[in-house]
Amino acid sequence: MTQKVKVIQTYNTFAQVNRVLKIKKSYSINEVVADVADFFSNENHWAYQYGTPTPDCNPKSPYHRKQIEVIFEEKYDHWDVNRAVDKLVEKGFLRLEKVGTANFVLRSDLRYYVREVKRRVKIIEAYASPVITRAVGNWCEKLVEIMFKLNDFEILRRDSNEFRGKKWTKTNQNLDFIVGKERIAYGVEVKNTLPYMEADEFLNKLEMCKYLDIIPLWILRNAPEVQFNTMKANSGLILKFKAQIYPYGQEPLVGEIWQTMRLPVTVKAEMPQKVVNSLLSFHSRVISGN
């Protein structure tokens, strides 16, 4: 299947790609600023309402900068939330506090926050440790592999950049899987991370799929609109599963992350059914040529 790939290799951030593709936002930066300011002022803000209650997350809490991006991601791109935070810092409504390599923001009028910042630093150090990040990544890849096998997709390659006699040499990168079903081959990338997939990796691997003549299929915790649009323009698919998946045995850490930081995390033994349904629906469309 020949792909019409729109790859913009001269740009290395998706904020730039967004401008080049002229994707119109559904919101203004002023709306994001107002919403983030309300989050730090109003305990009834929408971002505190979904999921189980988290009393330790409230307008008086300190927030890691990346944490705020994820909390707001269903409405705004991460970089736009980051811009809004910068503007609120410039206005003096918020202030920055750096602890080690962690950057926190909190309301400027708050005086007693050091203990809560230190508490969050310990949680961040726990989930960002190499042992946990490796376990989380490997676990999700294993669940994806099981999903493919249960739905009659053949694992053709693992951690590879070559297929059917062609080898990608432009960058030193591999696809997580190359899978096939009914003579259709897919290049698969799996990301079980809180941040978005990096722009350069996204674009390089999209170009790799074009070169190998396979359909790009990314299975991501989340992605910005520009990545969905770029993938659609390349006849591929992003499957989003939203909550970062942890292996069994990490329930205490997952509970602490949610209770203290309201980050979307969960413990699962299989990929969500909606991801499976979307995969099968997409494959049916590919087979039918639509």
Describe the predicted segments one by one:
Residues 206-214:
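Arginine/glycine-rich "motif VI" loop of SF2 helicases in the C-terminal RecA-like domain
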Residues 115-171:
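Acidic-basic catalytic patches of nuclease active cores, encompassing PD-(D/E)XK
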Residues 187-204, 226:
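Active-site-adjacent loop/helix micro-motif of nuclease/hydrolase catalytic cores
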Residues 155, 216, 238-239:
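Hydrophobic beta-strand scaffold residues
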Residues 1-128, 285-290:
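Nuclease-adjacent, charged terminal/linker segments that flank catalytic cores
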Residues 222-290:
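Domain-level recognition of nuclease-like catalytic cores that cleave nucleotide substrates
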Residues 170-188:
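Active-site beta-strand-loop-beta-strand hairpin of nuclease catalytic cores
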Residues 189, 215-219:
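Short catalytic-loop micro-motif centered on adjacent basic/acidic residues
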